Amino acid sequence: MINEYLKLMKPHVIWLLVLSALVGYIAAAGPLVNPIKLIELTVVGFLSTGGSAAFNMYYERDIDSLMVRTMKRPIPSGKVTPLNALTFSIAVSLSGFTLSYLWLGSWVTLMIALGWFFYAVLYTIMLKRRTWLNIVIGGFAGNAALLSGWIMAKPIDLESILLSMVIYVWIPAHIWSLAYYARDDYKRVNVPMLPTMVNEKASVRIISILNLVSIIYMLVLYQLYMAKLIGYILVIPATLAGIIVTIKALIKPSNESFRTMFKATSPILLLFLLAVIISRI
C-alpha cells in the first residue's frame, strides 16, 4: 500500500525537478555548499513536488481511467481512493512548505509554493484541458524548482534566470514527444496537445526543432557560464546523442522514433545538470 502512495508522487518524474533545485543551489554556492542544506532541500523538494504530482493524479483521475498509458495508476486501478489521494497530496504538500519555511526560509518557500501553484493549479486545473499551450505556461514550474535552490545562496540574477530556462525550454519537446506517440490517448479524452491540434507533418517539425533548440541552448549556456573540460565530457556526448535521435525522428517519423526521443530527453538534461555540478564544486 505504501508503494501505491509513493506512485502518486510520480518519483520517476519529480526526481529531475528535485535535482534541478539542487543544481540551482550548487551553481550559486559553489565550493561553499552546505551538505546539510542539500539534504534539507532534497527532502523539501521531494515533498512539495511529490505533493503537487499527487494532486495532479487526484484531479485527473477521470481521464487517467480512460487512457491506456495511465489506467493502471493507483486511483484508476482502485488501489487508492480519490479522497485518500487528495488528503495525501495536501498533507505531503503542507509538510514540504512547513519544512521549507523552518529550514530554508521564506524566500525559498515562496518560490517552492509558486512552482506548486504553476503545476497543480495553473497547469492541472486551469490550462491542461483548455489549451495546447498548457505546458508552455505551466512549464514555469520548472524554472521555480531551480530558482528555489539558487536563492538559498544568492539573489536571483541573469545567470540564474538563464540557467532555469534550461528546464523551461526542455519541457515542450519532452512532453510533446510523449504526446506524439500517445496522441490517440489524448484525443480519446479531449486533452489538447500539440500533436492532437496540428497535422502530423507539422508536429514532427515543431517537436524536432524544439528539441534541437533545447539541446543547443544547454551547450551554449554551458559555454557561457561554466566552460570546463570535465563538464564537456558530459555535455558534448549528450548534445551529439540528442541531435542524432532528433534527426532520425525528423527524417523517419514514427511512434517508436518519438518514443526514443522522449526517453532520451531526460538523460540529456541529467548529463547537463551533472556537468553544472562538477563545474561548480
Curated annotation (Swiss-Prot):
Recorded metabolic or biological pathway in which this protein acts: Porphyrin-containing compound metabolism; heme O biosynthesis; heme O from protoheme: step 1/1
Molecular function as annotated in GO: protoheme IX farnesyltransferase activity
Residue intervals passing through the bilayer: 13-33, 38-58, 85-105, 107-127, 132-152, 161-181, 206-226, 227-247, 261-281
Catalysis performed (reactions): heme b + (2E,6E)-farnesyl diphosphate + H2O = Fe(II)-heme o + diphosphate
Subcellular location: Cell membrane
Top-level enzyme category: transferase
GO cellular component: plasma membrane
Primary location: membrane
Record keywords: Cell membrane, Heme biosynthesis, Membrane, Transferase, Transmembrane, Transmembrane helix
Topology versus the membrane: Multi-pass membrane protein
EC number: 2.5.1.141
UniProt record, GO biological process: heme O biosynthetic process
Note: Carbon 2 of the heme B porphyrin ring is defined according to the Fischer nomenclature.
Family label: Belongs to the UbiA prenyltransferase family. Protoheme IX farnesyltransferase subfamily.
Entry-linked NCBIfam families: cyoE_ctaB
HAMAP family, A to Z: CyoE_CtaB
Role summary: Converts heme B (protoheme IX) to heme O by substitution of the vinyl group on carbon 2 of heme B porphyrin ring with a hydroxyethyl farnesyl side group.
Protein name, UniProt field: Protoheme IX farnesyltransferase
Species assigned in the record: Caldivirga maquilingensis (strain ATCC 700844 / DSM 13496 / JCM 10307 / IC-167)
